[in-house]
Each structure stands twice: as structure tokens, then as C-alpha cells.
């Protein structure tokens, strides 16, 4: 039961990864022209942006794990499930963030740059929350069945379904990001 209390941390870490990845391409600003001169392709740039967002967001996941162990008393299984779900969510949200950020970048520089258009940030936030809900839904269904109806479904099965769904969504988001990044890398003068 204590594992349920870790879900708000997962949502926070997931949204952090989403926002960080969404803004990562727009942060390049005019220095994006430098990328055109480098021997990199779109998939390399996308992977670099995803890896950066994953590494930074993993710090928040570790903090959430420490808080849950100290305050809630996570068991070993709950902690392992928390990390597995957290890493899955971070990778999916970072991939989704780069996909959205590549379609709605804002390269303008000024006193308050946005890095991603308002439309893109709204679309990305709504889709990001929906994706987090979809990934966590097998766990939620298993917990509801267990506590309300006394039907026991192995949480490891629900966790596996969440990870498989997350892996597919991360791959799909990565693939969706490639074409827009290729397009604006080709359009830049070398």
C-alpha cells in the first residue's frame, strides 16, 4: 500500500522530464546554426536531448525515492517498482517532450524566451499527462481490484505491462521527432 504514495512523485518527475525535453531544442536559439556545421544527424541530436533530460530528471527520481523511504517506509519491492516505473516515465516523457518540442520550437531570443510555442506547450502538457495516466493505469487497475474487490492480480504483471507500454510510447515519440529535426537541420545553411 505504501507504494501508492509514491505516485505523486512520479507525476512530478515525469512532468519535469517533459518540460525539460520540450524546451531543449528551442534553447539552442541562434546557436542552432552551429549544429548544421557539425557532423551530426537528427537522430544523434534527438538522442542527446533525451539523454540530457533523462539524466537531470533521474536526480529528482532519486530524491523522491529517498523521501519515500524515509517518510513512507517503502519496502524493497515498492522501491524497485518505483524506480522501474520512474525510469520508464522519464524516458517516455523525455521522448515525448523532444517530439513536441521539435514540432513547435521557438528559436526567438529576447528578455523572456519561450523555447517552445504556447500551442506546443499546451499540447505537450495534455499529451504528457495522458501518457503518464496510460502508463500508470495497469498499476492503478491492479490496486483497485486488489483493495476494492479482493481480486489479486500480480503487481509484477501490471508493472510489466506498464513498462512494455512505456517502451512502445518512447520509441514512437522518438520516431515522431526525427522528421521535424531533419527538416530544420537541412534548412539551415552550413
Where in this protein do the model-derived segments appear?
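Hydrophobic alpha-helical transmembrane segments of membrane proteins
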Residues: 1-31, 41-190
